[in-house]
Regions:
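Exported/periplasmic ABC-transporter solute-binding proteins
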Residues: 1-199
């Protein structure tokens, strides 16, 4: 079996693939699952270390696969052509991407799919430390949490009123369930909140 995921240093889908695999090891009670699917296929190997109920995965600065079992691309979207060509058997992708491209997918249980607010405490037990700090403002540690989509209107937006109107339009579309918007990203209407910053 050959698996592909995006570079965790460059794409959130990549570090989330690592988190999901670490969560799966615990959820299914399969010690060594992370090493067999991802960790053991790198040089040096990537270890999932469990201490006091938290699993930490420290990534090297450069993700170098040591064998053909794993493929890493800069963005998850670049895995699709590799999947189509038969270069990999599975790709870690968001379900919305799979739906958009007509791909088959495996539904993961809520305990590991990073999509359930009820399992937020479980997700937080997995930490991924990136091999370098890409952005000064957000640090290099990623802690598991439910995936959410967000929008903002920058304080220095040249047309803030129009930008807020656009945000309202998008939120209304989510609330109404517009055709073409995949189910996984349709939020609870009560959860969608916009904060308007004033200076």
């Amino acid at each position: 079996m050959r698996v592909g995921f995006s570079n965790p240093m460059l794409d959130a889908c990549g570090y989330r693939a690592i988190m999901v695999t670490a969560l799966a090891e615990e959820h299914y009670g399969e010690p060594g699952l992370f090493e067999a699917v991802i960790g053991g296929s790198f040089n040096p190997p990537i270890a999932a270390v469990r201490t006091d109920g938290v699993t930490t995965i420290a990534l090297p600065e450069r993700m170098r696969p040591a064998d053909e079992k794993v493929a890493v691309r800069d963005g998850s979207i670049y895995l699709l052509s590799l999947l189509d060509a038969g270069g990999i058997d599975y790709a870690f992708e968001y379900r919305s991407v799979a739906e958009e491209h007509g791909l088959r997918w495996i539904d993961l249980p809520p305990a590991i799919n990073l999509g359930s607010a009820e399992h937020a405490d479980d997700y937080r037990r997995v930490h991924v430390n990136l091999g370098f700090q890409r952005f000064r403002s957000i640090g290099s540690e990623r802690i598991g949490q439910p995936i959410v989509y967000a929008m903002t209107v920058p304080r220095n937006a040249p047309h803030p009123d129009e930008a807020r109107m656009f945000v309202d339009f998008v939120l209304d579309a989510f609330r109404e369930g517009k055709a073409g918007w995949p189910d996984p990203v349709r939020p609870d209407p009560e959860a969608a909140t916009v904060y308007h910053a004033t200076d």
